[in-house]
C-alpha cells in the first residue's frame, strides 16, 4: 500500500546545483578580487620594464632641450601682400624700361634733368659706338627681302631707320670733340669708329637719296679737322704721327671716295710731311721730321763719329 504512494517530484534546479564541484561552490568574491589585483600588478610591472629598458640601453643618450628654447614659441608671420621696395623694383627693369622711367620723370619734373646729367657716368667710346651699331643693325634689318637694295622702294622702306642712325651720329659726335673732350686719343678713337659706320651706309641709285650720306661725310670731315688741330697743339703733333693716324685717315679717305681729303690735308700740314707744291719749306720740314723720328727711336747721332782726346 505504501509502495504505491508516489514520491513527490524534485525540482530541476536541485539537480543542477548538485553538479557543481565543491571548489566552485566554495569560491568567494574576495578570492576573485585578489586574483584580478595580482594580474594587474603583473601587467604594471611588465609595462614598467618595457618603458625603462630604452633608458638603460647604452645606445640611448637622453637630450635635454635648453630652458629658453622650450619657453620660446615660434611666431607665425602675418602673411600679406605688399609692393616691392625701390631697389628690388629697379632690379626687375631692363634697359629700355629704365630709360623710359628716367625720361618720363625728367619730362614731368624738368628740374631733375640737370641732376640726371651730372649723376650719370660719362659715356665712353665703346658704349657709344655700340649704340650706333644697334641703329645700324636696325637699318639693315629694315631692308625688304629680295629686289634691288638701291632702289627708291628700298629707300622709302628704310628711310626712318636711316634717319634715326644719322640723328644719333649727329648727336653723339660733338660729345667727343674739343673742348668737351680734352683727350685727343679719345676723340680720334671715336671718329675712327664713327667713320666706319658712315662707310657702311647704303648707296642709292638715285643721287638725291645720297645727299644725307654725303652730308654725314662732310660733318665727319670737319670733326677730323677740329681734332687734328687741337692735337697738333700738344707736343707738336707727336700723338698724331706715332699713333698711325695718318695711315688710318688716308684709308678712310680712300673708302669715302675722297670726301675726307680736307682732313688728310690738315693732318699733313700739322705733321709737316705733306708733299705738295704749296709747301715752300718742304726740305726743312722733312729734315725736322727725320730728326724727330731719330730722337724717338733712339738712333739719333749713332752715325756721327765721336772725338777722343782734348777738345
Swiss-Prot record:
Transmembrane segments: none annotated. It is found in: Cytoplasm; Nucleus. GO terms for biological process: nuclear protein quality control by the ubiquitin-proteasome system; proteasome localization; protein transport. Its main location: cytoplasm. Residues 1-83 are annotated as: Disordered. GO terms for cellular component: cytoplasm; nuclear membrane. Residues 18-34 have a biased composition (Low complexity). Keywords: Cytoplasm, Nucleus, Protein transport, Transport. GO terms for molecular function: proteasome binding. The keyword rRNA-binding does not apply. InterPro entries: Cut8/Sts1_fam, Cut8/Sts1_sf. It comes from the Eukaryota. Belongs to the cut8/STS1 family. PANTHER family: FI02826P (PTHR28032:SF1). Involved in ubiquitin-mediated protein degradation. Regulatory factor in the ubiquitin/proteasome pathway that controls the turnover of proteasome substrates. Targets proteasomes to the nucleus and facilitates the degradation of nuclear proteins. Binds the proteasome. This is Tethering factor for nuclear proteasome sts1. The lineage of its organism: Eukaryota, Fungi, Dikarya, Ascomycota, Pezizomycotina.
Amino acid at each position: 500500500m505504501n509502495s504505491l504512494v508516489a514520491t513527490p517530484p524534485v525540482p530541476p534546479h536541485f539537480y543542477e546545483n548538485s553538479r557543481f564541484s565543491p571548489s566552485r561552490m566554495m569560491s568567494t568574491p574576495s578570492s576573485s578580487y585578489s586574483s584580478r589585483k595580482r594580474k594587474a600588478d603583473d601587467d604594471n610591472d611588465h609595462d614598467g620594464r618595457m618603458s625603462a629598458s630604452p633608458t638603460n640601453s647604452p645606445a640611448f643618450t637622453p637630450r635635454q632641450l635648453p630652458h629658453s628654447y622650450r619657453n620660446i614659441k615660434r611666431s607665425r608671420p602675418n602673411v600679406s601682400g605688399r609692393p616691392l621696395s625701390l631697389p628690388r623694383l629697379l632690379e626687375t627693369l631692363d634697359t629700355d624700361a629704365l630709360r623710359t622711367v628716367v625720361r618720363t620723370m625728367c619730362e614731368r619734373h624738368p628740374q631733375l634733368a640737370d641732376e640726371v646729367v651730372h649723376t650719370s657716368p660719362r659715356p665712353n667710346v665703346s658704349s657709344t659706338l655700340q649704340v650706333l651699331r644697334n641703329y645700324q643693325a636696325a637699318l639693315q634689318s629694315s631692308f625688304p627681302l629680295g629686289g634691288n637694295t638701291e632702289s627708291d622702294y628700298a629707300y622709302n622702306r628704310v628711310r626712318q631707320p636711316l634717319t634715326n642712325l644719322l640723328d644719333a651720329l649727329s648727336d653723339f659726335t660733338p660729345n667727343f670733340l674739343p673742348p668737351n673732350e680734352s683727350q685727343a686719343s679719345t676723340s680720334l678713337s671715336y671718329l675712327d669708329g664713327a667713320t666706319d659706320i658712315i662707310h657702311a651706309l647704303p648707296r642709292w641709285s638715285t643721287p638725291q637719296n645720297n645727299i644725307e650720306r654725303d652730308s654725314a661725310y662732310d660733318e665727319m670731315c670737319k670733326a677730323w679737322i677740329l681734332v687734328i688741330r687741337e692735337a697738333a697743339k700738344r707736343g707738336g703733333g707727336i700723338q698724331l704721327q706715332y699713333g698711325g693716324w695718318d695711315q688710318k685717315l688716308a684709308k678712310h679717305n680712300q673708302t669715302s671716295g675722297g670726301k675726307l681729303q680736307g682732313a688728310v690735308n690738315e693732318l699733313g700740314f700739322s705733321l709737316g710731311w705733306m708733299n705738295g707744291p704749296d709747301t715752300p719749306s718742304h726740305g726743312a720740314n722733312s729734315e725736322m721730321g727725320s730728326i724727330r723720328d731719330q730722337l724717338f727711336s733712339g738712333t739719333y747721332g749713332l752715325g756721327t763719329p765721336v772725338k777722343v782726346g782734348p777738345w
